[in-house]
Amino acid sequence: MSIFSGIWIPLVTPFSRGAVDHDALRTLIGAYRAAGVSGFVALGTTGEPAALDEAEQAAVLATTLAAAGDLPVLVGVSGNQTASLRERIAQLNEVPVAGVLISAPYYIRPSQAGLIEHFASLADLSEKPLVIYDIPARTGVRIELDSLLTLAAHPRIQAIKDCSGSPETTLALILDGRLRVLAGNDDEIFTTLCMGGAGAIAASAHVSTERFVALYRALTEGRLDAGRALWHALVPLVGAMFAEPNPGPVKAALAAQGRIENELRAPMTRASDALHLRLKQLAAA
């Protein structure tokens, strides 16, 4: 069975007095392991990698790998120059990550032919499985279904974090069966799992983690009524977690629980006071 299933946590990077708080990161990972998650993403969007220098990124990845134990760790990679990303892939070939999560090149909006060439070039070099991260709202370019089906033929490309917002694309990929489809938009977790998706990479699951794991198990075991009840209870939390730019709300919720400091690096900002109060209430529920 593929490792790319279940509930994965795209970890925040905790800060304390401006520095990465590795102790808080270890504690979070330990709690999520105990809650039954299937894996972790280090240096994904929620982890503020653009705010970290190269040494900090390496240290965060090392801490995550050590704390994750036997659970798999994906590492996020992004950029808009194929050559520089190939250098990063070569570096990661020497690191014991379970795979690499790669988004489309941002800002420059390449053609579909360019996207196929880009991902294939990285997959050819990688010794690790690749998970395509389709998030057009952030990159400015959508990876079309035909392109994804072409890339699915590459043996290194094994899964997709699906933030396309297209239920037609999601279902087509699930029916094709070659890529493991992981929901990337948290408000689509229920529908993706009901369609036969493999799991989710869910920022909201930093809080009420056990409920997200229970939701996954209920739906994959065919217990629809139980899954629906769990999902309905989670909907307010999911909505609040994305009411303002990620990861501000996630960090606010964790800070409300006393698990991390409520710190981000500019230009990202803390959640508003009103949202912080709402998240505190939801996190305590």
Give each language-model segment a name.
Residues 22, 54, 145, 221-224, ...:
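Alpha-helix N-capping/helix-start residues
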Residues 5, 38, 43-46, 75-78, ...:
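Short glycine-rich loop/turn motifs that provide flexible caps or phosphate-binding loops at active sites
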